[in-house]
C-alpha cells in the first residue's frame, strides 16, 4: 500500500460547486473543482455493474465515460482509472471525465465493491474507505482492473487496447497489474505516486531506505508494458524511493520513465489548487506545475502506446 505523510493522508474536502469553479481547461479537475466539472461535462457517463471474472456472481461497480467524438465511426482505446485509498470519489470520476475528454474511453472501478458489502454508487466517507481498502487483496486489485478493461473493450466504440493509470494506492495497483501481465490488449501503465509491488511490503514506520530496499527486481523483471511513473520530491516515502525504482528499471532495460517533480507533494494532482491554509505558496505552485507538465505528457504517452486497432 502506498504511504503518505500525516498531512497528506488527511481526508480530502471539497468546496461548494458552482459553474465558474471548474479548474484549468485541458487538465483534470482538482479536488475542489471536480463536482462542478462533472456537472458541466458534455460527455456521456454512467454507472455499470460488471462481474469480477468468468463465473463470478458478485459484481464490480464502475463509472464509465465516453469521449465526445465528432466522428461517429471513430473507436477509442480504453483507460482504467484506479482510485486512491479514499475509494471511488467525485475527484476520481472527474479525472475519468478528463481522460475521456482527451479521447479515451475511461472506466473507474470501485475496488471496494466487495468489502463494502456489494456494488453501490454512493460515495463512501474518506475514513471509511481508508479502513475498508485494507481488506482488498492483491489478486482482487488486478482482477478488478482486468474486469473493467474487458468490459470497456467490449463496447462497440472501443479498440482492443487498454492502459491503467492510478493514484497512491491506485498507483501501486497499476504497478501490480503491470507485473502480473493483465489481459489481452494491455499496452501501458502510469502510476502516480505509488510504488511497485514489493517483497512483502513495509510498515508505515519503515525508513525510506527500508522502503527502497523492499522493491523487488524479480517482480519488476516481469513488467512487459511501457511504464511512466510520476511523483513529488516532497513525498517523504514514495518520492524518496523513486530513485531505487528508476535504477532497477534502467538496469532491466525496461521501457520506463520516472519524473519526481521538485517541490510537489504526494497527491499533487488532486492538490493542485489546495487553499493556502493547507499548503504554502511554494507547494501550491509546485503541485500545479507538476500537473500542467505531467498530464499532457501522460496523454501523449498513452496515445503513443495505444495507437492503431
What are these regions (language model features)?
Residues 223, 229-231:
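Short beta-strand/loop motif that positions the catalytic acidic residue
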Residues 255-309:
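C-terminal catalytic histidine-bearing segment of alpha/beta-hydrolase fold enzymes
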Residues 20-74:
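N-terminal cap/lid segment of alpha/beta-hydrolase-fold proteins
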Residues 145-222:
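Primarily recognizes the serine-hydrolase "nucleophile elbow" in alpha/beta-hydrolase
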Residues 76, 82-87, 233:
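Active-site glycine-rich loops that stabilize anionic/oxyanionic intermediates
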Residues 90-116:
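Short amphipathic alpha-helix adjacent to the substrate-entry channel of hydrolases
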Residues 73-76, 122-167, 305-308:
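Gly/Ser-rich "nucleophile elbow"/oxyanion-hole loop immediately N-terminal to the catalytic nucleophile
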Residues 112-139, 270-280:
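Cap/lid segment of the alpha/beta-hydrolase catalytic domain
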Amino acid at each position: 500500500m502506498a504511504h503518505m505523510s500525516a498531512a497528506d493522508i488527511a481526508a480530502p474536502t471539497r468546496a461548494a460547486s458552482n459553474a465558474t469553479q471548474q479548474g484549468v481547461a485541458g487538465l483534470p479537475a482538482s479536488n475542489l473543482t471536480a463536482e462542478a466539472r462533472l456537472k458541466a461535462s458534455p460527455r456521456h457517463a454512467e454507472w455499470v455493474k460488471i462481474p469480477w471474472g468468468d463465473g463470478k456472481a458478485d459484481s464490480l461497480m464502475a463509472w464509465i465515460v465516453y469521449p465526445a467524438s465528432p466522428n461517429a465511426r471513430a473507436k477509442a482505446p480504453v483507460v482504467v482509472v484506479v482510485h486512491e485509498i479514499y475509494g471511488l470519489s467525485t475527484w476520481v470520476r472527474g479525472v475519468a471525465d478528463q481522460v475521456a475528454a482527451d479521447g479515451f474511453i475511461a472506466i473507474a472501478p470501485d475496488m471496494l465493491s466487495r468489502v463494502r458489502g456489494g456494488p453501490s454508487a454512493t460515495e463512501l466517507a474518506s475514513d471509511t474507505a481508508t479502513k475498508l481498502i485494507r481488506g482488498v487483496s492483491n489478486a482482487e486489485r488486478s482482477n478488478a482492473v482486468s474486469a473493467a478493461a474487458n468490459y470497456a473493450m467490449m463496447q462497440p466504440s472501443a479498440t482492443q487496447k487498454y492502459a491503467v493509470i492510478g493514484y497512491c494506492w491506485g498507483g501501486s495497483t497499476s504497478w501490480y497489474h503491470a507485473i502480473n501481465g493483465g489481459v489481452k490488449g494491455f499496452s501501458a501503465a502510469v502510476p502516480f505516486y505509488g510504488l511497485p509491488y514489493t517483497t512483502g511490503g513495509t510498515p508505515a514506520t519503515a525508513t525510506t531506505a527500508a522502503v527502497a530496499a523492499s522493491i523487488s527486481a524479480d517482480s519488476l523483471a516481469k513488467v512487459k508494458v511501457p511504464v511512466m511513473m510520476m511523483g513529488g520530491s516532497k513525498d517523504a516515502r514514495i518520492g524518496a524511493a523513486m530513485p531505487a525504482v528508476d535504477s532497477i528499471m534502467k538496469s532491466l532495460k525496461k521501457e520506463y520513465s520516472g519524473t519526481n517533480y521538485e517541490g510537489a507533494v504526494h497527491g499533487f494532482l488532486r492538490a493542485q489548487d489546495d487553499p493556502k491554509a493547507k499548503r504554502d505558496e511554494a507547494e501550491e505552485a509546485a503541485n500545479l506545475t507538476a500537473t500542467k507538465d505531467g498530464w499532457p505528457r501522460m496523454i501523449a504517452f498513452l496515445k503513443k502506446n495505444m495507437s492503431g486497432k
